[in-house]
Amino acid sequence: MSLQNFVRVHNATLSFWQSVVSQRVRQQLELTGAKVSHNLLLKHPAIAATAQHVKLTAKGTPPGPDTLDLTDPDQQMVYLSHLAYEKALCLVESDVQRAGAFDTEYRKYSDKDIIGFASCVTTFAEYYLKYAGVFAYNDWKELGEDISTYGVINENDNGNGFSLPSDARVAIIGDWGTGLADAQALLVDIIERHNPHCIIHLGDIYYSGTPEECVNNFSAIIKNAFDIAEKDPVPVFTIPGNHDYYSLGWGYYSMVYGLNSEIGTAAFQPASYFCLRTEDGGWQFLGMDTGYNDSDPADQADPFYAGPWLQPNEIEWHQDKLNNFAGATILLSHHQLFSSNAKINGAWSDFSALPSQNPYLYQTFLPYFSKIAAWIWGHEHNFVMFENDLLGLSKGRLLGCSAFEELTSSDPYAINYPDIKNFIDPETGNMIQLSTNADLNGVTYYNHAYAVIDFSGRTNPTDPVTTTYYEYPSWGDNPPDNPEATQLYQEQYSLPAVSEVQVPYLANTYLLSQDGQFIGPEYKDYPYMSNDTPVAQQFYPVVVTSGNYLTHGDKLRILTTDSSVGDKNQLGAFTRKSLYYDDDNNDKTAWYVYKRDTSNGMDIHYGDEVYFVNADWNQWMLPYDSVGLSVLYLTTEENANYYWSITLPQNSALEGITAIPKKSPYRKKHLPFMKQEKNVIV
């Protein structure tokens, strides 16, 4: 059973060891003139031995004389992989003495080393020493790029661009970079059946995204798929997963820089995050890089680790794209926002009581849920449609199963976190689940899946789009006759509906600025703006005109729930430029609230855009940049026409959590990947 040898673990150095051994075996087989596929590699005894070594080590029981029968040649090979790997780690850490001890033990069995694990040691150590643990990552701000244009895919990129037609079909695949035969067959099916205008991958090229794997398990297979389908190539965009960074990201960046030119398209993706918009400006895809902060071996031992999270400057980049786009957004990530099956936050993390949700991603994008039609992610090797509007997100969809062979025995549909509810098909009353397929050995796998988003047929730019999910046979070692995709489900992605819920007085609410920041904590009674730590406000009527709910033109007070200010909890505009909290019951702490658009009536609902005008100064409330300080405070200004949205706290368990960790015992280093570095090799 060769696919039993396709072991993947959440460990950077073990995954990279698998990559190095796989490359060594491939090189040896190619010397014989054989046509080498990943399926063929998996049948090699050295790959089988390494898989067993990696599996045991990941479980905390590394192979050794106490756990193996070292008179058995196959188990000797498992032990050799272990010894060579440990020696390589010692060399990377400059621990010559321990490396020598592993080498002495290795020599006892070196006559059984049929592929040369010793050379794998050299390759492993040289790669890590070459990059000195420094990751590849292109930070737009560090590069001095323009935030408004960097990473935005368009046809005016120095003559090498791509424009997404308004009637486009976009195919989405996840965790596809296995290099297996059914991965290529699935892509051929997409190209032949749907003729997409572009293809987007949600990350993970196995085992560790080395330059060699990024070619053999990704770009070369994409090129072959277009050749087999006899179709002109279309652009392919990909965001990184954790496996893409297990070799520090240099393989991923070297591939993505040249991917589209090599397959024959004019598109170019300069970073691990991107923005792709329809020509009519109605819809945009935002791809994010969650892999970078789930890539370090220290992650597994970090007691503060939960997440992952985005880099601070990337958060600012996404906010810019959401703040300055009037249409609907589809978010794309490798990692999950939430899960009903997998634990996201470790048992010793700060968020162990919240194991099924990513607190950092939630706080990053919560202010924009009214603009986000859907969020599609991978990482878990399954297809799941979660309940609509769960935790305030219109649609969350898991699509991490486009090539990964998921055994039914792994039970990916087990509901370990019942608070994360799955979507129920109203016609059948059941969850939407993948079918299964057994190979000739009786081993059963869940099928693969992909999505096609169809933008055609819209009258207005922001009209809904049709998304169809398909499943494709997963066949292990034995392909079925004439495999073909079948439809799983079809649904509409649309902008979230305008809230029908009126805003009541004396209820906790958040005030979200037109620039995407909340009114946050206070400093010496002065509230400041925050991306990720909103502080709830309450409205108290000065003159009630329409009962218990806010209405256009009401006069009210804005009260903070921040206990640090005590009884001085009324937001006021006094003689100082900055607004602050006090307890004066006069017009300086009174505000008029006006709806920006009254075409749907005078009642104020959650999500409505409103102005706050101070009753004493007759000036609009807005943030301002206080010179010399790193945060925005509040002030008033005449005729500012600055608007706010009143939002309902969606998840009280996440209040006070920031979009990035407050502290961590280690810091990663990264360098930008430049075009001249594209020919990086292991």
Language-model features: locations:
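Extended active-site neighborhood of metal-dependent phosphoesterases/phosphodiesterases
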Residues: 119, 126-159, 212-325, 329, ...
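Short, Asp-centered acidic motifs that coordinate Mg2+ and/or phosphate
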Residues: 170, 197-198, 328-330, 374
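Active-site glycine-centered loops adjacent to acidic/histidine catalytic or metal-binding residues
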Residues: 175, 203-204, 241-242, 288, ...
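Short beta-strand micro-motifs enriched in acidic
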Residues: 388, 454-460, 596, 624-626
